[in-house]
Amino acid sequence: MKILVYGINYSPELTGIGKYTGEMVEWLAAQGHEVRVITAPPYYPQWQVGENYSAWRYKREEGAATVWRCPLYVPKQPSTLKRLLHLGSFAVSSFFPLMAQRRWKPDRIIGVVPTLFCAPGMRLLAKLSGARTVLHIQDYEVDAMLGLGLAGKGKGGKVAQLATAFERSGLHNVDNVSTISRSMMNKAIEKGVAAENVIFFPNWSEIARFQHVADADVDALRNQLDLPDNKKIILYSGNIGEKQGLENVIEAADRLRDEPLIFAIVGQGGGKARLEKMAQQRGLRNMQFFPLQSYDALPALLKMGDCHLVVQKRGAADAVLPSKLTNILAVGGNAVITAEAYTELGQLCETFPGIAVCVEPESVEALVAGIRQALLLPKHNTVAREYAERTLDKENVLRQFINDIRG
């Protein structure tokens, strides 16, 4: 098939949506599909355009797929308004490269959310070219915005009503909606999408990469990061933004400062400088910050953690399913997850006892108790690893998805 992938995040971004979209495109091309990509220059999670890329110029790249990079506004400190301008700027700049694909006549257009701002252009191209459309939802942008109080006066405000109407239009006017969890599938149905048009397309893990991590690689990375051998590692690896509520990790580290533990915060994001300042003001010698590590180092990094933190604010847990969790499960890590019992993560922990420790969000007491509980467990979590092997293998997930969208 001729497949056009349209979304703001793409390789070489190392985390989150860009990583998964890039791996999907490589897999599709390797299966013999003709793939084109319309995207932006890499900027996430640093919120800074990568070296050798420009935020202001178009760029065409040839490889496994033909890629068009489109200009966009990248705020250094993303606020709600700046984030909307950021997403909108990509929707505008990518419109003409998108329309240019009419002559190519793609068979399928896969639009990756965020950003919903791109949905109208995708639908127009589909109408002009005869393509079928798939809107793949990695993040319910509107729900996340409302759940985190970023839309002003809550769900009844004009901004919230406008955003909800725009989202409804995007969801109802595509051929299929795919998303990454069962609860997010149910949410699509609640928003009016016909159940037969909803596709389960979870984030995957390259299971084999995480099954046989050499102890020597773990020791080498530990030495490189200058982490002591006589202390257990409480690891957070990923985006450092507003959805996570990492202030509570600072509080937890403060309460556990006299125990033989190191809180290792690995990653980038708009909230990192503020967290570093908080830790410095409290004199937390048991907390260290590190830049995002390379993808090659990820298996050793995750195996190094004695306890993994998957932290989100209340209200965000069902709008966003953390992609980092797939690899934590694959490596057999013990995770402490902050999520309400009714959410996807809460249900996961209830359905598969022992897969992780689930605690109340935004509670320092619960987080500290969860960390203590996780540290008492065997270092290798067989429940987590077996779940990953059964349900998160990359080849199985992508093969099922392509079968689903063939129609």
UniProtKB/Swiss-Prot annotation:
Keywords assigned by UniProt, alphabetized: Lipopolysaccharide biosynthesis, Transferase
GO BP terms: colanic acid biosynthetic process; lipopolysaccharide biosynthetic process; slime layer polysaccharide biosynthetic process
Associated pathway: Slime biogenesis; slime polysaccharide biosynthesis
GO molecular function, one term: alpha-(1->3)-fucosyltransferase activity
InterPro entries on file: Colanic_acid_synth_WcaI, Glyco_trans_1, Glyco_trans_4-like_N, Glycosyltransferase_grp1
Pfam families, per the entry: Glyco_trans_4_4, Glycos_transf_1
UniProt superkingdom: Bacteria
Gene3D superfamilies assigned to the protein according to its UniProt record, in alphabetical order: Glycogen Phosphorylase B
NCBIfam families, A to Z: PRK10307.1, wcaI
Stated name of the protein: Putative colanic acid biosynthesis glycosyl transferase WcaI
Species assigned in the record: Escherichia coli (strain K12)
